[in-house]
From Swiss-Prot:
Signal peptide: none annotated. This is Norsolorinic acid reductase A. Its EC number is 1.1.1.-. Keywords: NADP, Oxidoreductase. Pfam families: Aldo_ket_red. The gene is aflE. Pathway: Mycotoxin biosynthesis; aflatoxin biosynthesis. The active site is at 74 (proton donor). One of its GO terms (biological process) is aflatoxin biosynthetic process. Norsolorinic acid reductase; part of the gene cluster that mediates the biosynthesis of aflatoxins, a group of polyketide-derived furanocoumarins, and part of the most toxic and carcinogenic compounds among the known mycotoxins. The four major aflatoxins produced by A.parasiticus are aflatoxin B1 (AFB1), aflatoxin B2 (AFB2), aflatoxin G1 (AFG1) and aflatoxin G2 (AFG2). Within the aflatoxin pathway, the norsolorinic acid reductase aflE may play a role in the conversion of norsolorinic acid (NOR) to averantin (AVN). Induction: Natural plant compounds carvacrol (CR) and trans-cinnamaldehyde (TC) strongly reduce the expression. The lineage of its organism: Eukaryota, Fungi, Dikarya, Ascomycota, Pezizomycotina. NADP(+) binds at residues 69, 178-179, 204, 233-243, 300-308. Substrate binds at residue 148. Belongs to the aldo/keto reductase family. Aldo/keto reductase 2 subfamily.
Length: 388
């Protein structure tokens, strides 16, 4: 018997990838961020009603996307409720790889008089948050549960044992961590492995061409720990615009700082050469810098989502990556600058021990290169047309 070959996906979003070396679940190369879905924060973030949110979810899903990110406190709970209603109406829960988060005070606008234990990393906060998330999402399991941030009061032992209890009982499949120092993540994973518990498989945090702190410790930590990366803020949070564009539209997003202005000009220049958008270059940039990178892409407009999906086909050369790096100098800090940098050599994330200048005194060393990211597919479909 000859087994059929899977049909060609409708867009590049449908070519799925392994989440991380420690999590074999298959996910779309972009993760749909949903923080704007809801009425709870419309006074601050602008309006994104349920119809618009469902349209975004439908477009993402119909384009082949299955990786959706929510959190317990987004929009006062509207986000989880709406995503839960959407999955129930579409009857596609098991097709979706759903991530949510606990730690933030998700009852801040609720009726409870005493709210101190509805936030934090501790066991009670975790139990209450996951129970509420499962109800709002209309599901009996969460694919990926993040510690949203480290509270610096709960012990590593309590966090990892409490999280593992949820995994052992089938309520959670994989664990992630967000907005937490690298040394704490390593400590958590070491404790988990030493005690037969589930370690973290994914890290979520702020990373873009203008905000490269991620590259100091988080990126090498994830490489060493076998963790995937789900960076947010990749598109510059509305700041990656040329001076001309920002003069027209920037009033809605606050002032543009000099760093984003310089990078916006560089990204815009490169985008014009490639007949694309500056934000598409920004997205391709992080996906070219390391393997297992799944940008969290949000927003309220379907046309922007389609641009993000089409950007999956963008190819950046090593020289173009270097140009973006050099547009805004980045100090990697000690000890990496001491080990790798010289008057003629700047630190790059793909460097290995052969690039340590102190070791070149006695020998010319050749080393195995670091693992490279998946190259963008060429010739796959976008929206009704073939890529070139």
């Amino acid at each position: 018997m000859v087994l059929p070959t899977a049909p060609e996906p409708p867009t590049l979003l449908g070519y799925h990838r392994i989440l991380s070396p420690s999590a074999g679940v298959r996910v779309s190369p972009l993760c749909l961020g949903t923080m704007s879905f809801g009425n709870g924060w419309k006074g601050v973030m602008g309006e994104c009603d349920q119809a618009t949110s469902f349209n975004m979810l439908d477009t993402f899903y119909e384009s082949g996307g299955n990786f959706i990110d929510v959190a317990n406190f987004y929009q006062g709970g509207d986000t989880e409720r709406w995503v839960g209603e959407w999955m129930a109406q579409r009857q596609n829960r098991d097709e979706i790889v759903l991530s949510t988060k606990y730690t933030m005070g998700y009852t801040m606008f609720g009726p409870q008089k005493i709210k101190s234990n509805f936030q934090g990393n501790h066991a009670k906060s975790l139990r209450l948050s996951v129970k509420a998330s499962l109800q709002k999402l209309q599901t009996d399991y969460i694919d990926l549960l993040y510690v949203h941030m480290w509270d610096f009061t709960t012990s590593v032992e309590e966090v990892m044992r409490s999280l593992n209890h949820l995994v052992a009982n089938g309520k959670v499949l994989y664990l992630g961590v967000s907005d937490t120092p690298a040394w704490l993540v390593v400590k958590c994973n070491a404790f988990a492995r030493a005690n037969g518990l589930t370690p973290f498989s994914v890290y979520q945090g702020h990373w873009s061409s203008a905000f490269r702190d991620f590259e100091r410790d988080i990126l090498p930590m994830c490489e060493s720990e076998g963790m995937g990366l789900a960076p947010w803020g990749v598109l510059g949070r509305g700041q990656f615009r040329s001076a001309e564009e920002f003069s027209r539209e920037g009033r809605k997003m606050g002032p543009q700082d000099e760093k984003h202005r310089r990078l916006g000009e560089k990204l815009d220049q490169m985008a014009q050469q490639k007949n694309t958008k500056a934000t598409s270059i920004a997205q391709a940039y992080v996906m070219h810098k390391a393997p297992y990178v799944f940008p969290v892409i949000g927003g309220r407009k379907v046309e922007h989502l389609k641009e993000n999906i089409e950007a999956l086909g963008l190819v950046l050369s090593e020289e173009e990556i270097r140009e973006i790096d050099d547009a805004e100098p980045f100090d990697v800090g000690f000890p990496m600058n001491f080990l790798f940098e010289t008057p003629t050599q700047s630190y790059r994330t793909n460097m290995t021990s052969k690039d340590i200048w102190q070791l070149s005194c006695n020998t010319r060393l050749e080393t195995v290169p670091k693992q490279q990211p998946i190259e963008p597919l060429q010739g796959a479909k976008y929206f009704g047309s073939a890529s070139k």
